[in-house]
Amino acid sequence: SENTLRNWLKKGRKYLDRMVVELKRIALEKDAVVNCDETWCKVRKYDRYKKCYMWVLVNKAERVVIFFYEDGSRGRDVLTNFLGDAELKALMSDGYNAYVFIGDGLKTHRYKDTDHQVCLAHVRAKFVKARMEGGDKRADVFLDNINRLFRFEREYDREMITDGERTRRRQGLPTMEAMINLRANLLQELKSEEEQKSCYMREALNYLHKFWNEAFTYIKDGRYPISNNLAERAVRPFTTKRKNSLHFGSDEGAEIAAVYHSIISTVKLQGRSAWDYLGKFFTGIFNGCRDFLSLTPQNIDLAVCQ
């Protein structure tokens, strides 16, 4: 029955909560580079369903995914409460206001040394919309140059170059030429008559202008991603299920979902079977193991507690 399943999920959460704490510590290690995103879900509150938000943070290098939920809020406090005193190297997001304090010493001292990245794929999507829905041909030059930058990244991936070599190439002449072309066209379009542009083109230009530095922060370090696709893929199960009337009966239900999705998504990112991992994890728990570091997906095959 649903009650039996709910009770088993609650009992499992007691131990998986501690595993998520361990995974969070790994994901937020000093100088980590992370991706972050959020998506909405329906949660029952006071006899009605309310639009609430589930957040996700991904550390690609450590192959860890953490979902977090705080009373359904999409406010900045949810992110700052989760990050705590983490000393991140960089955080990638979209241009949502809850992230803009990252790396801004005037807005917060805590994360002033963290590079805030804004997804270049989001920038591209706005120019695609200007071209397709706004019919604005002037978007083409922006799309050509942005697509050129993405082609470079695919080449680097195919060649499997080191992070250091990727940094060197990102700061080379081909990238600089594309950025110079983008900047020149951006400044030219911003000076042109507003009436000549579609509303979508104005939105794309203003977005690129506002987040220029953040969109091109990726060239500073070969470890930095060019887009936020990693986090967006992680939240996709929520967006897919939402179309099939996914909802949670309470905040507690959403919190439980965050725990299980954190574990399952982390295991999948590591190319493992979620069922296989959960079986080994709970076998270790039933046999008395409480060394949660040894029970992480990265280490469970090496666990000495059997």
List PLM regions with ranges:
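Catalytic center-proximal scaffold of phosphoryl-transfer enzymes
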Residues: 1-306
